[in-house]
Design a protein with these regions (language model features):
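Membrane-interface loop-to-helix entry segments
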Residues: 72-89, 132-144, 252-270, 315-324
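Extracytosolic (periplasmic/ER-lumenal) interhelical loops and adjacent juxtamembrane/interface segments
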Residues: 30-73, 207-249
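Interfacial helix-loop-helix junctions of multi-pass membrane proteins
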Residues: 24-34, 118-138, 201-212, 250, ...
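Membrane-interfacial alpha-helical segments at the cytosolic side of multi-pass membrane proteins
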Residues: 82-96, 143-156, 263-276, 325-337
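N-terminal signal-anchor transmembrane alpha helix
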Residues: 6-38, 189-201
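Small-polar-interrupted transmembrane alpha-helices in polytopic inner-membrane proteins
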Residues: 10-21, 105-123, 186-194, 286-304
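Membrane-interface helix-loop-helix junctions at transmembrane boundaries of multi-pass membrane enzymes
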Residues: 2, 93-108, 176, 272-291
């Protein structure tokens, strides 16, 4: 691999760290550790950490109590995200200098998306954890890591396909690859919807709305309020920390996340099975197995979240594994798409 490959993998690794750190900040209730943005109680570097600074900060930001641990968690996440943004802008510059037009277009789009993601980060704080903003901020991070991984795949397309004679080894008809391609896009839709439901569950503090498994509160169909569960409240003067929904609405969110997981899981298994059967290249078969393993690990983590009352390390792993599952599916989809285009 050349230096660009190593740099891309480095940036992807940092992105995964930012995603998991963001999950940790949210799950440790540090999302409002700093009431302003981009600084923390007016400090761009550091936080108020002595008694005089804390008194001054609390007098300026009425209603806020300085929690040093929460403030540092939030600021470390912001600093790391800021460095990540710079690293991604450098990627665009690299492909611009190399005159790699198609790769530059994708990297430039990622750079623009990073700016949008930063704006969502700001609104997450200024709108006091408004659930729809927090959910899209979570999904935005997963989109960024998926696009960076796609950029890595496209940069290495020659070594992945031509050098390994991928197409000559793939004995598959146009009809078969077309059906596989459609299935892969449908699977991507189901997984993204499941991730969004997971984000909605987390941002509405509904992860423990069902306290048992496989039943929900000792019932196969508990009392639920679907209308309020998925009603998007756009009030800008409310504090959404710890959630504002009543129990039936939170149960409806949690239960929907479980139900959709069944459909998403089944379609991922079907895609993996068909890919394993139809694509004859060894690393394609390996990729199908990895997809299924990540799926079952994700299910296990989801069950443990409920059974163990949401331990933070399990919940953070659940978020990080979702990113890996999405990356794996994007890889599968890219190989299927490229095979279809070249047959």
């Amino acid at each position: 691999m050349d230096k660009i490959n190593y740099y891309l993998l480095f940036v992807i690794t940092i992105t995964l760290c930012v995603i998991t750190l963001g999950a940790y900040v949210r799950l440790s209730h540090a999302g409002l550790g700093c009431p302003d943005w981009p600084g923390c109680y007016g400090y761009l570097v550091g936080i108020p950490d002595n008694s005089l600074e804390i008194i001054a900060a609390e007098s300026i930001y009425e209603g806020s109590k300085v929690d040093i641990m929460k403030a540092w968690k939030e600021m470390i996440h912001r600093y790391l995200a800021g460095f990540l943004g710079i690293f991604i802008f450098i990627i665009s510059f690299i492909f611009y200098k190399k005159s790699s037009y198609n790769l530059f277009k994708l990297s430039f789009f990622i750079s623009l998306f990073v700016i949008f993601q930063a704006a969502l980060g700001m609104f997450t704080v200024t709108l006091k954890l408004q659930p729809v903003i927090v959910m899209f901020h979570l999904v935005g991070g997963l989109i960024i890591i998926s696009l960076l991984w796609l950029l890595f795949l496209r940069y290495n397309s020659n070594s992945f396909f031509e050098k390994n004679s991928f197409y000559s080894k793939t004995k598959i008809s146009k009809k078969e690859i077309k059906s596989l391609s459609i299935l892969s896009y449908v699977t991507l839709f189901f997984l993204i919807m499941q991730i969004m439901l997971g984000g909605w569950t987390s941002t509405n503090y509904a992860a423990l709305a069902c306290v048992d498994f496989p039943k929900c509160n000792a019932s196969w169909w508990p009392q639920m309020d679907f209308y309020n569960a998925f009603f998007v409240e756009l009030a800008t003067n409310l504090n959404y920390e710890f959630g504002r929904l009543d129990s039936p609405a939170r149960v409806a969110i949690h239960f929907t996340h479980r139900l959709w997981a069944i459909f998403a899981g089944l379609i991922i298994i079907i895609l993996a099975f068909k890919s394993y059967k139809l694509l004859k290249v060894p690393y394609q078969k390996f990729l199908s197995l990895i997809l299924v393993l990540l799926l079952f690990f994700q299910i296990l983590l989801g069950v443990l979240n409920v059974k163990m009352s949401l331990p933070i390390y399990i919940a953070v792993l659940h978020n990080g594994n979702a990113a890996l599952l999405l990356i794996c599916l994007v890889t599968q989809l890219y190989f299927i798409y490229t095979t279809k285009k070249n047959i």
